[in-house]
């Protein structure tokens, strides 16, 4: 999911066709050639007519029609609805952007034993790559088609329906969403709201021309969550803000790696981010890191795995380890650079250390059963409960939250009037390709 506070811890070208080979000459050219040969044969036949059977006029050959290949190249629809497994029938998905290890980690490129052990992780990586391809195609469509005037509900449901279609998991059958689909709700946080906002049922909020919207969503296969985010604006005045945060995220990706300390990553991110400023309505604003938001590691079916990647200088001496998956994300703000919980809650998840407490409300018991069977430890929102046909569940949900069984994640906001931006990618730290793999 998009963010973790310290307090709580171009479009793929699928249309490429093979270049024409010599036997793929246009039908018209073939017919002209055959016609010329047949005319010559007819003249020779006339000169020796009646002599022998071999001298008889040759029959005019009909040009063979080239049989068309069945199926053709499969392409993605608009909106995206073709499962990526249909687009990549061999099950081999793009690797993503690769960044070579440097310095002391360069040995991973040549170590034969490391390469052998890494190949054993191929199934694990293919699940991540499939989810990454889903995310790439959906976000590319979203970036082209999100426009001012659309409601947030329309935008969120459009993204979520696309993810479900491309993973091949609608999430309507019991347990289906645990197998694949949405890794967490689609966050659409606007302006001073930095993270964890998605519309609840009945929300009428509309995206405006002057808004700065963070789009943060996850796709997963078998619990391998691909968590990536970007920021959309429609006014170039905000370009320096977006450039600052994008630069900071890319810096974090470059600095991260096996055995690197979190404090070093955070210091590099802060230096990159806070070298920018943005002018809004005649006032210069320094871009600040939102110091109580962090990146995080990701475990199977668990979006926040327990480790945090700070985006400011810190004393955290924790190291990244081989085999870990991290969401490297940064947040920049024109405000105070500190977020608090505000607005109506929409995001929830089963608490990792949920207590075993008796539930007296039948609505709470029924809802907990539904959550366990349909979401497990994956985050969900109220709209996801709605689409499963549930109603009048809010009392039970609040009871689960107050009992500590379900954790709520309210929207995280800087001061009103400020603007925030976010960029995020998932990174894998394996000797598997002796690289850092960025989605």
From Swiss-Prot:
Listed GO molecular functions?
initiator methionyl aminopeptidase activity; metal ion binding; metalloaminopeptidase activity
Q: Which Pfam families does the UniProt record give?
A: Peptidase_M24
Q: Enumerate the subcellular locations listed in this protein's record, separating them with semicolons.
A: Cytoplasm
**Cofactor, how bound (note):** Binds 2 divalent metal cations per subunit. Has a high-affinity and a low affinity metal-binding site. The true nature of the physiological cofactor is under debate. The enzyme is active with cobalt, zinc, manganese or divalent iron ions. Most likely, methionine aminopeptidases function as mononuclear Fe(2+)-metalloproteases under physiological conditions, and the catalytically relevant metal-binding site has been assigned to the histidine-containing high-affinity site.
Q: Which InterPro entries match?
A: Creatinase/aminopeptidase-like, Met_Aminopeptidase_Type2, Pept_M24, Pept_M24_MAP, Pept_M24A_MAP2, Pept_M24A_MAP2_BS, WH-like_DNA-bd_sf, WH_DNA-bd_sf
GO cellular component terms, A-Z = cytoplasm
Say where the protein is mainly found. cytoplasm
The EC class name is hydrolase
The alphabetical list of record keywords is: Aminopeptidase, Cytoplasm, Hydrolase, Metal-binding, Protease
Binding of a divalent metal cation 1 occurs at: 216, 227, 424
The prosthetic group or cofactor this protein requires is: Co(2+); Zn(2+); Mn(2+); Fe(2+)
Q: Which biological process, per GO, is one annotated for this protein?
A: proteolysis
Q: Which CDD domains does the record cross-reference, listed alphabetically?
A: MetAP2
> Where are the stretches annotated Disordered?
1-90
Catalysis performed (reactions):
Release of N-terminal amino acids, preferentially methionine, from peptides and arylamides
Binding of substrate, residues: 196, 304
Which EC numbers characterise this protein's activity in its record?
Answer: 3.4.11.18
This protein's source sits in the domain of life called Eukaryota
NCBIfam families from the UniProt entry = met_pdase_II
Function noted in UniProt? Cotranslationally removes the N-terminal methionine from nascent proteins. The N-terminal methionine is often cleaved when the second residue in the primary sequence is small and uncharged (Met-Ala-, Cys, Gly, Pro, Ser, Thr, or Val).
- Could you tell me what this protein is called? Methionine aminopeptidase 2-2
């Amino acid at each position: 999911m998009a963010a973790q506070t310290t307090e709580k811890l171009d479009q793929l070208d699928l249309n490429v066709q093979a270049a024409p080979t010599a036997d793929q000459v246009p039908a018209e050219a073939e017919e002209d050639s055959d016609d010329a040969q047949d005319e010559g044969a007819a003249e020779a036949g006339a000169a020796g007519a009646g002599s022998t059977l071999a001298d008889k006029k040759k029959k005019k050959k009909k040009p063979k029609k080239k049989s068309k290949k069945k199926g053709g190249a499969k392409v993605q629809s608009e909106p995206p609805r073709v499962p990526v497994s249909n687009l990549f029938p061999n099950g081999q998905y793009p690797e993503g952007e690769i960044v070579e290890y440097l310095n002391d980690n360069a040995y991973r490129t040549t170590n034969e034993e490391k390469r052998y052990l890494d190949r054993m992780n191929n199934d694990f990586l293919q699940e991540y790559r499939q989810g990454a391809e889903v995310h790439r195609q959906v976000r590319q469509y979203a970036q082209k088609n999100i426009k001012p005037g659309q409601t947030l509900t329309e935008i969120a449901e459009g993204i979520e329906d696309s993810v479900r279609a491309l993973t091949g998991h609608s999430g309507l059958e019991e347990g289906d969403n645990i197998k694949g689909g949405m890794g967490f709700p689609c966050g659409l946080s606007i302006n001073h709201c930095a993270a964890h906002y998605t519309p609840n049922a009945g929300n009428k909020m509309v995206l405006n021309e002057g808004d700065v919207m963070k789009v943060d969503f996850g796709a997963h296969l078998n619990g391998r969550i691909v968590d990536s985010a970007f920021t959309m604006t429609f006014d170039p005045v905000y370009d320096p803000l977006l450039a600052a945060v994008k630069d900071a995220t890319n810096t974090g990706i470059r600095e991260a790696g096996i055995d690197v300390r979190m404090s070093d990553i955070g210091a590099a991110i802060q230096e990159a981010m806070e070298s920018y400023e943005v002018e809004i309505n005649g006032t210069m604003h320094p871009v600040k890191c939102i110091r109580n938001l962090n990146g995080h590691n990701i475990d199977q079916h668990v979006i926040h795995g327990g480790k945090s990647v700070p985006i400011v200088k810190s004393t955290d001496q924790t190291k990244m380890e081989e085999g870990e998956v991290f969401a490297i994300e940064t947040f920049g703000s024109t405000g105070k650079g500190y977020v608090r919980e505000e607005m109506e809650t929409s995001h929830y998840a089963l608490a990792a250390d949920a207590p075993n407490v008796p539930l007296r409300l039948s609505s709470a018991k029924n809802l907990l059963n539904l959550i366990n069977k349909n979401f497990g430890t994956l985050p969900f929102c109220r709209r996801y409960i709605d689409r499963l046909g549930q109603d009048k569940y809010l009392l039970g949900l609040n009871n689960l939250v107050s009992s500590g069984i379900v954790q709520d994640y309210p929207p995280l906001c800087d001061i009103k009037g400020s603007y925030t931006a976010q960029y995020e990618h998932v990174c894998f730290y394996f000797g598997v390709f002796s690289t850092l793999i960025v989605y």
